[in-house]
Amino acid sequence: MAIKIDGDINQYIKLVGRSDESVKTEVQHIIDELGCTPIIQEIDEEFLACDETKTNWLLRDSGVDFAWENDRLEAIFLYTQHLYAEYSVYSGSLFSQFSNTATRDDIVQCLGKPEGQGKWNQSWIRYNNPNGTWTNFEFDDDLRLRMVTICMPVV
């Protein structure tokens, strides 16, 4: 069952899965607002299927990555804790009901039972969005939010 998450996270949720002309313009607008220049990382074609392209727009100074596949925005990664030396923490408030470093229990209390959960490298929970995408919450060892991923469902 899809759940609507309140807050500025929606500016990102509405973009994932789109490949229309305006999606890159909307992403560029966000980049301009964040005030940084992305590092464009093209994935080598020898690792991809025929006629497939994958590109990552890394906004390390803002704690955001955009992952593109064949001109469709496949995923957005928002780093809410300092995970990697080269990345800053996302500074904006993403959620109206809880903080960017809320506990797993706080998030479940606000959003209800997750659609998926597990532990792969770190503990995570997943909610389905109304637009058919997923929002994944990944937690540190103290079960505090460390990264939010909005992505297309894994098939």
Segments the model singles out, each with a brief description of its role:
Residues 2-77, 83, 99-155:
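A cross-family detector of function-defining hotspots
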Residues 85-87:
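Preference for well-ordered, secondary-structure-rich cores of eukaryotic proteins
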